[in-house]
Amino acid sequence: MSLNDFLAKSYGSKHGKEKTKKSKDKSSHRKSDESKRVTSRNIDIIDKANLITEENKKAASSNKTGKSLWKNLETEKLELVQHVDVDKKDDSKERMSSGAFAGLQTAEEMEKQIAEKEKLSMQKSGLLKKNQNTVYRDEKGKVIDGYEEELKLREKANLTAKVRKEEELKIRNIGEVQISKLDRKTEKSALLSTEDPLNQGNTLRGTNTSLLGRRLYEKNFPENRFGIVPGYRWDGVDRSNGFETKWFAKSHDIADQKIKEQTTNREF
C-alpha cells in the first residue's frame, strides 16, 4: 500500500464526502425556498388578475352599475371606478351633430336629447380637469413658480415702452412749421382775450405795468432814445421840443449813408 492511498483512506475521503454533501444540501434548501417564494408571488398576482377580470366580466354582463375594477397603485387596493362612455351612440337611430336624433320629433324630445349630450360632455370635461393646469419648466427641467405673473409684468412693461417710443417719435417729427402753428394759436388766443369787450371792464387782467408796478400807456406813442413808455393817464399830445424826432431822423440818415458807401466801394 502506498502512502497516498493510506492518507486517502484514513483522512481525505470521508471529510471530502461530508463537505460536498453539506454544500449540496444547503444549495438545494436555498433553491427550494426561492422557488416557494416565486411560486407564492406568482399565485398572488394570478389571483388578483383573476379577481379583476371576474369583477369586470360581472359588471359588463350586468351593465347596471357602469363601474369597473381598478388597482390603486398608492394604496395597493382594488377600487370600483365609474365608467363614462361619452362617445356612446344609439345603434337604432342616427344622431345629428347637435346630439338630437334624426327624423320627425317634437321640440321637447329634441331639447332632452341635446341636454343629454351636453351632460355627457360636461362629465368628460370634469374628468379631464385634473390635467388642465400647465406646468412651466426651465432648460434644466426645474418647475418655474409664478411664470404667468412674470409674463403679465413683461407685457405691461413692453406696452409702456411702446407708448413712450411713439410719443418720442411724435415730438421728433414735429418740424418748424408745426411749432410755428402752435405759436400762432397761442398768439391768437391772447389777442382774442385782449380784444374781448367783456375784458375791457376788468382793469386787473391784461394791463401793462412798469417794474415799480405802475400802469403804463397801452396805445401808440412816439419813440424816444431810452424806450420810456408814458403813463396810462397821458392824453396823447406830444408836448416836447421835437428833439427826439430830429435825433431819430439824423441817425437814420447816417445809417443810409454808410450803406451807400459800402455798396459803391465794393469791387465786382
From Swiss-Prot:
Residues 12-29 have a biased composition (Basic residues). The lineage of its organism: Eukaryota, Fungi, Dikarya, Ascomycota, Saccharomycotina. GO terms for molecular function: RNA binding. Residues 1-41 are annotated as: Disordered. GO terms for cellular component: cytoplasm; RES complex; U2-type spliceosomal complex. Keywords: Coiled coil, Cytoplasm, mRNA processing, mRNA splicing, Nucleus, Spliceosome. Associated with the spliceosome. Belongs to the CWC26 family. It comes from Kluyveromyces lactis (strain ATCC 8585 / CBS 2359 / DSM 70799 / NBRC 1267 / NRRL Y-1140 / WM37). InterPro entries: Bud13, CWC26_splicing_factor. Residues 104-170 form a coiled coil. GO terms for biological process: mRNA splicing, via spliceosome. The keyword Cytoplasm applies. Involved in pre-mRNA splicing. PANTHER family: BUD13 HOMOLOG (PTHR31809:SF0). It is found in: Cytoplasm; Nucleus. This is Pre-mRNA-splicing factor CWC26.
